[in-house]
């Protein structure tokens, strides 16, 4: 009877074959949309997890290899020399140690040089100043010149900085305005309307002021005396008795304050009207005076001054003693009223 011994190395190969067979079956079932058994589903999940782990491990190894390559470029080595990862790490550690030693040595040298410079330049500035003073009074002060130059340079730099800041600020303001114009067009419209309203109000106010000034000028021109009659026969006629003539004569003889203030001018007008009514007396008397005035205008220029005397004489006979006094005062020019 013969016995066949199965070697132990073939057992894992059979297990591996069975696993691969199950994976293939699971993949075919997933492709054919066939419901999987629980065992095949577990195998498929394991396969997916294994693939994910393999990809992560691959990435990790790639990053490690890249780090070793960068270290290899940093450390001193000959071109074409092949170095393992352990050799690269060892050489980098040695290189870092040597760099630290070099750093400490340079720091010690730097401190020694600083001390040497301080020892040499400890009393030198005082000696130099004393020597400069001993040389002569008219020697130029170098320190002041250097300070002045430094100040000038600082001023120039500050001006340049200010110009740059101004240009930047103007650019930013323009950008802000453009953004506001894009984002808030309604706000700009409201502002424009407000500006237009303000301009309209200002125009109305100016027109009102101009109107008031024109009215004041008209009042002043009305209150001013007429030009002195010289050559025209119709203008040479003395102040006629009707109300307008008396009004003009009395106001011109009044003070300057009467022309300036409106209230005083009104009071003067009232008093003038009362005086004129008192002088005229009755309506019949006015008609007679108008006829006499027409007769005076028709006469030549030489007979004009005689007309008021005859008129006043006829008026004095018909009027009272008080009215006659007032009529004499007015042609003579003394027409001031209380």
From Swiss-Prot:
Q: Name one GO cellular component term.
A: nucleoplasm
**Chain intervals for the UniProt region annotation (Leucine-zipper 1):** 100-120
Residues involved in crosslink (Glycyl lysine isopeptide (Lys-Gly) (interchain with G-Cter in SUMO2))? 147, 187, 189, 285
Which residue stretches does the UniProt record annotate as biased composition, category Basic and acidic residues?
Answer: 283-294
* Phylogenetic lineage: Eukaryota, Metazoa, Chordata, Craniata, Vertebrata
Region feature Disordered, mapped onto this chain:
118-141, 283-338
Record the organism: Homo sapiens (Human)
| Recorded superkingdom | Eukaryota
* Name of protein: Transcription factor AP-4
Keyword DNA-binding found? yes
Location comes to: Nucleus
């Amino acid at each position: 009877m013969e016995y066949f011994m199965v070697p132990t190395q073939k057992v894992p190969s059979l297990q591996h074959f069975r696993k691969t067979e199950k994976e293939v079956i699971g993949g075919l079932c997933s492709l054919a949309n066939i419901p999987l058994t629980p065992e095949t589903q577990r195998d498929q999940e394991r396969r997916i997890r294994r693939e994910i782990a393999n990809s992560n491990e691959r990435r990790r190894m790639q990053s490690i290899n890249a780090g070793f390559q960068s270290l290899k470029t940093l450390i001193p080595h000959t071109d074409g020399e092949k170095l393992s990862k352990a050799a690269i790490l060892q050489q980098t550690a040695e290189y870092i140690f040597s760099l630290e030693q070099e750093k400490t040595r340079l720091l010690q040298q730097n401190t020694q040089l600083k001390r040497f410079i301080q020892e040499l330049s400890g009393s030198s500035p005082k000696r130099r100043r004393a020597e400069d003073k001993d040389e002569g009074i008219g020697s130029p002060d170098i320190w002041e010149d250097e300070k002045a130059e430094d100040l000038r340079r600082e001023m120039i730099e500050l001006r340049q900085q200010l110009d740059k800041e101004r240009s930047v600020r103007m650019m930013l303001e323009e950008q802000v305005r453009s953004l506001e114009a894009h984002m808030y067009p309604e706000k700009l419209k409201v502002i424009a309307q407000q500006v237009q309203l303000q301009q309209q109000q200002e125009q109305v106010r100016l027109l009102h002021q101009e109107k008031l000034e024109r009215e004041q000028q008209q009042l002043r021109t009305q209150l001013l005396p007429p030009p002195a009659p010289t050559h025209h026969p119709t203008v040479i006629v003395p102040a006629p008795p009707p109300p307008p003539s008396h009004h003009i004569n009395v106001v011109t003889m009044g003070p300057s304050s009467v022309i300036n203030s409106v209230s005083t001018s009104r009071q003067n007008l009232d008093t003038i009207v009362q005086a004129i009514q008192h002088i005229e007396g009755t309506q019949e008397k006015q008609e007679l005076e108008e006829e006499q005035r027409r007769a005076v205008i028709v006469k030549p220029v030489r007979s004009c001054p005689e007309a008021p005397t005859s008129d006043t004489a006829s008026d004095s006979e018909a009027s009272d003693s008080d009215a006659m006094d007032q009529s004499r005062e007015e042609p003579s020019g003394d027409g001031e009223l209380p």
